[in-house]
Regions:
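Unchanged
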Residues: 42-65, 75-126, 149-151
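Conserved Nudix-box catalytic region and its N-terminal flanking loop in Nudix hydrolases
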Residues: 16-58
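Charged phosphate-binding loop/patch that engages nucleotide di/tri-phosphates or the phosphate backbone
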Residues: 130-151
Length: 151
């Protein structure tokens, strides 16, 4: 019997004029190319907001601040691991002129609305991607003040 591992991750839903910024990357388990929000694991010395801003910078080259908290999603993956994902909303005032991902694992970036995402040959990395988009489209906007550092 394998032991369940818990992963705390953060994700950035970057939303501009009805479209979402998605990164194209290779899923490390399956090897297939997928679409995801800029997302990743928190590091030990980070709080949630610092972690999500770092992920945005690493995966897009953009320096942005979140406008709202979208909530928490959870997924039990096929590898037996549980992923707890803290979703944040970023709403830039203007379309960025260029992207310069710092992470070599990012293959491309795409601005897509939900219908375009669903029509893509590249699948979302997991249901968590669609869940975060649905939270945004449903109007979920939780205040960032609800996220308090523990120390």
């Amino acid at each position: 019997m394998s032991r369940n591992r818990l992963h705390l991750t953060v994700a950035a839903v970057i939303y501009y004029q009805g479209r979402f910024l998605l990164v194209q990357e290779r899923d490390k388990l399956s090897g297939r190319e997928v679409l995801n929000q800029p997302a990743g694991h928190m590091e030990e010395d980070e709080d949630l907001l610092s972690a999500v801003c770092r992920e945005v910078y690493e995966e897009t080259g953009l320096t942005l601040l979140p406008s709202a908290w979208l909530g928490i999603s959870q997924l039990k993956a096929s590898n037996g691991h549980t992923y707890v994902r803290v979703n944040f909303l970023f709403e830039p005032d203007q379309l960025p002129a260029a992207f310069q991902p710092q992470d070599p694992d990012i293959l491309a970036l795409h601005w897509l609305d939900k219908s375009q995402l669903l029509a893509q040959k590249l699948p979302p990395r997991s249901q968590l991607v669609l869940d975060a988009i649905d939270l945004c489209l449903a109007g979920t906007r939780l205040p960032l003040s609800l996220i308090q550092p523990l120390c």
